[in-house]
Regions:
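A well-ordered secondary-structure block
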Residues: 37, 156-220
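Short proline/glycine-enriched turn/loop segments at secondary-structure junctions
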Residues: 198-200, 318-323, 346-350
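N-terminal, active-site-proximal structural segment of metallo-dependent hydrolase catalytic domains
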Residues: 3-142, 153-162, 166-172
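Metal-dependent phosphoesterases centered on the DNase I-like endonuclease/exonuclease/phosphatase
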Residues: 232-336
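Conserved beta strand-loop-helix elements of the APE1-like EEP
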Residues: 142-145, 170-186, 213-216, 320-339, ...
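Solvent-exposed loop/turn segments at secondary-structure junctions
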Residues: 63-66, 124-128, 154-158, 183-184, ...
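Surface-exposed cleft-lining segments at the edges of enzyme active sites
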Residues: 90-96, 124-128, 191-200, 227-236
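Active-site beta-strand/loop signature of hydrolases that rely on acidic residues for catalysis
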Residues: 57-63, 90-93, 103-133, 178, ...
Length: 364
């Protein structure tokens, strides 16, 4: 009897081991990184050209794949309350398909209300289990039908069977750049990313999207949408990413182009680490960047209301004003031949764990 039980247990263990090895092999076979310098087409291309001396509006907004209503927390986020209580997020997917659609439409309406000429959006799901297969890319492109758009995939993962009771699933997601003006060319540039065994399967395929727009007089307006790494202990990968971005910024300035780089920097870009009331300690992932960290001739266009309105909340707990940790990580870098004035928009974190940022600018 004991031998029979032992054989059964051994068989169960062997089956489990085969399952694990098979799953790891599946993840490895499915794993890939998109090539650097990948050219991307503009959908619904526009024809009007950008002009010097004219005022324009640009917006950036991380829509958080439609999951982050105020009552949402994310399983990968951790934190600590001021009293030392450890916190960890709960969910790997949106709360429901209904909530997913409501948040996506809410974010779209918030974007449309700002009447921007150019729009950067991050964490836009195209086909993902975490968002119940709701195609946010299609919804935004249809809702912003008067714009040309380009999509850069920066998250393509095989089915992640974790957490076990609510698997994150497979994901195809990325960044969308919208423009009411003519785009000559789009190039997806690959950021350095971690190749650690587990991290490479779960982290984004980080990139930045470079879009070139003709300007009267022969120069170009170069729009660069970015989404830098957040989960990087020691900041080594983020330092490499910033170095590459600065290399590109410097090259464009040497050519006399107008440059705006914007998006989710996942760094404090407004000296806001301790600006807002909070019942939580400052998270480990919050690093500070300022204009001194940028290539010569560039600056962060700090929002005039950056001390009053944060752009990102911690997602380790549901959002509660003055309790959940908040900081400014979204915004724009501008070259010194651009006059710019930015404003953080108070969206109340109703549809995303981010608030939008809008910037008015003029090419000098």
């Amino acid at each position: 009897m004991a031998k029979r039980i032992g054989k059964i247990l051994l068989g169960i263990f062997a089956a489990f081991l085969v399952l694990i090895v098979g799953y790891v092999a599946y993840m490895q076979i499915q794993y890939y990184r998109i090539d650097d310098f990948t050219k991307l087409a503009t959908e619904n291309p526009q024809t009007e050209q950008v002009q010097k001396g004219k005022a324009y509006r640009i917006m950036t907004y991380n829509i958080g794949f439609g999951a982050y209503s105020a009552d949402y927390s994310f399983f990968m986020d951790t934190g600590e309350m001021l009293d030392g209580t450890k916190t960890v997020g709960k969910h790997a997917r949106a709360l429901s398909e209904k909530a997913e659609r409501e948040n996506t439409e809410g974010s779209l309406n918030l974007v449309k209300s700002q009447e921007a000429d150019f729009i950067f959006t991050q964490e836009v799901d195209e086909k993902a289990d975490r968002s119940y297969q709701v195609n946010q890319r299609e919804i935004f492109q249809k809702g912003l039908s008067g714009y040309g758009s380009v999509f850069a995939n920066n998250f393509h993962s095989a089915y992640l069977f974790y957490p076990f009771l609510e698997p994150h699933g497979a994901v195809q997601a990325g960044m969308l750049t919208f423009s009411k003006y003519q785009i000559l060319e789009n190039t997806r540039r690959q950021f350095p990313v971690s190749d650690a065994f587990i991290t490479k399967f779960t982290d984004l395929d980080r990139c930045f999207l470079v879009s070139r727009l003709p300007v009267d007089g022969g120069k170009e307006l170069v729009l660069i949408q970015v989404h830098l790494s957040a989960y990087d202990k020691g900041g080594l990968i983020r330092a490499e990413q910033l170095a590459l971005l600065n290399e590109v910024l410097a090259r464009e300035r040497e050519q006399g182009n107008y440059v705006i780089a914007g998006g989710d920097f996942n760094h404090d870009i407004a000296e806001s680490i301790e600006s807002f009331p909070s019942g939580q300690k400052t998270p480990e992932w919050v690093y500070q960047l300022d204009s001194d960290d940028l290539a010569d001739g560039y600056r962060f266009a700090k929002a005039e209301n950056a001390a009053e309105i944060p752009t990102c909340r911690g997602a380790d707990i549901p959002y509660e004003k003055d309790v959940t940790y908040t900081v400014v990580v979204d915004g724009f870098i501008v070259s010194d031949n651009i006059e710019a004035k930015a404003e953080n928009i108070d969206g109340g974190f109703l549809y995303s764990d981010h608030n939008p940022v809008v910037m008015e600018f003029t090419l000098l």
